[in-house]
Amino acid sequence: MQRCSVCNAVETLLVDTQITSRFLPLLAEALAGQCELRLDPTAREILGDDYPAATEEDWATEYNDTILAIRVVDGLEEALEHIRLYSTQHSEGIVTEDREEAERFLQLVDAAAVYHNASLRFTDGGVFGFGGELGISTQKLHARGPMGVEALVSYKYRVYGDGQIRSS
């Protein structure tokens, strides 16, 4: 875990039910002592009651801390619904070898940046080549995503003519 207080940190991890029994113990071991895991009931069945139970509030919280909420989902549809309900619309990602599922995720998730098999930490104005990041917008009007100076300016068009007209 690195830089948990930044806006592109991961707060919630959705794990497909098909891989939970193999993946969750490996994840818990890798993150032991590095962060607090808050688990849904299915994840707690696998990892044990020593971990705190995740609450409804956890799914919508940006912790800015070393906390990771984990929820087990039954397939892409359930993951998409969770994201639709709780996403900040900043950055969302999917880790999968299934390209069709990944493309579907990238198409259907409403976020300023969507990722397939890449770190969400790339959502950054400097990384995207915009220069120093001045902000990040999750709105759909005007700029969306990391913004540099260019995204914050508006344009004024000066049009000079010699009597030209526009035909219908």
What is each model feature region?
Residues 26, 76, 81-167:
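C-terminal core of ALDH-fold dehydrogenases
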